[in-house]
Amino acid sequence: VYGASKLAGERAITAATNRFIVIRTSWLYSSFGANFVKTILRLCAEKPLLNIIADQIGTPTYAADLAQFIAQLIMNDNLQAHTGIYHFSNEGVASWYDFAISIRDIAGLETPIFPIETFQYPTPATRPRFSVMNKKKVKDSFGFSIPYWRDSLEVCIKKIKQ
């Protein structure tokens, strides 16, 4: 089951103490390492066309935005008053297909990308169809301004191209 080990980790933490902060995130990418953004850029250069899942909806999260949030969280004078599970991802929603189209367009590439359904691309773990996170607790607790995913994607692709 997708996410089972993550849930087990959260349960272990909550069972061990009542003073904790867990940050859940989704669809994480950056200019470093292996991730969806870098994979799409590479595949656009290697393949004549791409087929990308269009029926799974979530929110891409730029690792630099997550890191900035965590740094602000740690520096919060009232950190001790905040415990629990917090959701952090960029603002907005997208399908993997929407995300891939944006990556291609921002990078100035022209590879044709076609939408497919999940069943057409089997994976070992079944991913959720809708994984958009509610960030109300993060916003209410810390007043953090969360960038829109496409704006952050532009920043990331600019860094990759440097």
Regions found by a protein language model. Give the residues of each.
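Active-site helix of classical SDR
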Residues: 5
